[in-house]
Amino acid sequence: MKAVIADGQNGVEVISDAPKPTPEKGEFLGRVIRVAFNPIDWKTLYNASIEKGTVGGTDFVAVVEDVGEGVDRSKYIGATVSGWAPGPLDGSNAAWREYITLDVNLVYFVPKNITPSQAATLPLTFTTASQGLNQYLGLPLPPTDGSKNSAQQKWVLVWSGSSSVGQYVVQLAHHAGYKVIATCSPHNFDWIKKLGADFTVDYHDPNVVEIIKKATDDSVFYGFDAASFPETSTLAVKAFSSKVKDGKLINILSSPPSPRSEVKIIGIIDYSLFNREFNFFGNKIEPIQASYDHAVEVYKKLTGWLQEGVIIPNRVKEFDGGLQAIPKALREFASGKHSAVKFVVRID
């Protein structure tokens, strides 16, 4: 079986003798037809400390060919599903290979109204967005009956609204009934507003904090920093309302000190949804049952949200060529010379 692995020289290479996995109890075996890139893919594989031979890849779309014990064959065999695997943190269960196995509860069925490439843009970053906004901040998920959540006068600030995570945070916050203000580059303003932002701000503007406060009438009470750099988190916290007493800003991975005692920065790690422990370059990531339960709930509802147009996938930059195309495409992705698009490689 072909797979893409760390080559031990801060790069990746394609091999043809990787073992084909076998589904265990509660799992499926799928033939991978699409993979999408996330920053963790290149940041882990382009790293001298990663073990040579580690298989890479997180987001995938696959056609189910077999299932393990306890899984309804009539429901899954032949179905097209999408999810994300632990990837480089667990090289035995990663997406960049011809076949993949995973817990059937951690994938969603791809609806007919979106393409496999669009489907590949969702798993990891949508999970991250929902984990932060819905699980940790407690904002309601979009209804599944066509109704709407009640409107709120409070604002949610989304820093880096045009990132993959940010685009899904904007949509989820909008459907939660909150007003949304997002930072991004001006050329992405229209797209981010289409996704649900009420106001967009150029994060390059030296007065970005003052602009946010004025636009929201000093009413930002929740935030999600999808960039999660120390400087972006500091600016985001400063933009919170002067009236806030228990503000919360979601940060991916880390929890840096907050410049305001009344605003807490909450670091989230989406790997906690897997029922096993990971070592993230010396930092232990332990499983959290609530994160697994939340992910299962979200994946059950995601197919319907996509069918109804409640959730819009990221825009796609697609690469042909199968697994052999990944090394070159990954280098382009790592260069950062792209905006508001998700890199997807066709494997079939």
Swiss-Prot record:
Record flagged with keyword Manganese:
no
Tell me the GO molecular function terms. oxidoreductase activity, acting on NAD(P)H; zinc ion binding
UniProt entry tagged with the keyword Kinase: no
Q: Which residues form a coiled coil?
A: none
Q: What InterPro entries does the record point to?
A: ADH-like_C, GroES-like_sf, NAD(P)-bd_dom_sf, PKS_ER, Trans-enoyl_RdTase-like
**Main localization (coarse):** mitochondrion
Q: Give its localization.
A: Mitochondrion
Report the sequence similarity comment from the record.
Belongs to the zinc-containing alcohol dehydrogenase family. Quinone oxidoreductase subfamily.
UniProt-recorded name of the protein: Zinc-type alcohol dehydrogenase-like protein C2E1P3.01
